Regions:
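Short beta-to-alpha linker loops that shape the active-site pocket of alpha/beta-hydrolase fold enzymes
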Residues: 49, 73, 78-82, 165
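Mobile cap/lid helix-loop segments that gate and shape the active-site cleft of serine hydrolases
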Residues: 4-13, 164-199, 205
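Short amphipathic alpha-helix adjacent to the substrate-entry channel of hydrolases
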Residues: 56-76
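Short beta-strand/loop motif that positions the catalytic acidic residue
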Residues: 203, 208-215
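Catalytic nucleophile-loop/oxyanion-hole region of alpha/beta-hydrolase
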Residues: 55-56, 62, 79-116
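Primarily recognizes the serine-hydrolase "nucleophile elbow" in alpha/beta-hydrolase
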Residues: 100-177, 191-192
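A domain-start/cap signature at the N-terminus of enzymes
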Residues: 1-28, 38, 89, 175-177
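Short beta-strand element of the alpha/beta-hydrolase
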Residues: 39-48
Length: 215
């Protein structure tokens, strides 16, 4: 899924809000804390934004720096934003980018002094939905792929869901996120596939979920 977009970023008091993303990236924030002979845990951080943008500092970089203070290395995902993509690609791009990010982190774990079995994912709002999608739609590596990195597992070892969107089914779906991810009139197969409470399986990683009475 390529696109012909021009990169677009806005700014507010919280920092950068990426809108149109041409090339997905992971921004690496290594923890400088060291423990003798113990590799670090790592977390892939996924900002929210309703699948129309990415609140990159408030729910990304700032969180990565906080994780660093705990001795955890962090990666912030700048994924392609579904709202701006073609109808054929909008439901695919964010998950593809999250899966590739997890593969890259795990494949480079020795080089980055990371425990390959302690790589989690943390997401906010729509980023929480992508986090739960990655957790329920992962693989253990695509052995037949001609792309070497795709042979690495995309499964997170744990997930942290912060005021997440979870379901795409009314009446509990966040309809803005649903529309931006699946389009105006999605088919029922897509709605069910991305309703992650229905997709939990035996190898889904453990999760912790936060909501407040203001969410």
């Amino acid at each position: 899924c390529g696109n012909n977009l021009k990169e677009d970023v806005e700014y507010d008091s919280s920092g950068r809000i990426f809108k149109k993303v041409v090339n997905p990236e992971i921004w690496y924030y290594p923890s400088l804390k060291t423990s003798k002979n113990i590799k670090k845990a790592a977390v892939l951080v996924i900002p929210g934004g309703g699948y129309k943008g990415l609140w990159f500092d408030k729910e990304g970089v700032d969180v990565a720096k906080w994780l660093n203070s705990l001795g955890i290395s962090a990666f912030v995902l700048k994924h392609r934003v579904p709202f701006w993509e073609s109808n054929d690609c909008r439901s695919k791009v964010a998950l593809l980018d999250a899966q590739r990010a997890m593969r890259i982190i795990r494949a480079n774990s020795d080089k980055w002094d990371i425990n390959r079995n302690k790589i989690g994912v943390l997401g906010f709002s729509a980023g929480g939905h992508l986090t739960s999608t990655l957790s329920t739609h992962h693989d253990n590596g695509l052995e037949l792929s001609k792309i070497e990195i795709d042979k690495t597992s995309s499964r997170p070892d744990y997930s942290i869901l912060v005021y997440p969107v979870i379901t795409m089914k009314p009446p509990y779906a966040h309809m803005g996120s649903r529309k931006n991810l699946l389009g105006e009139i999605p088919n029922e197969e897509h709605v069910t596939y991305f309703s992650n409470e229905l997709q939990v399986r035996e190898d889904t990683p453990p999760a912790i979920l936060f909501h407040t009475d203001q969410d």
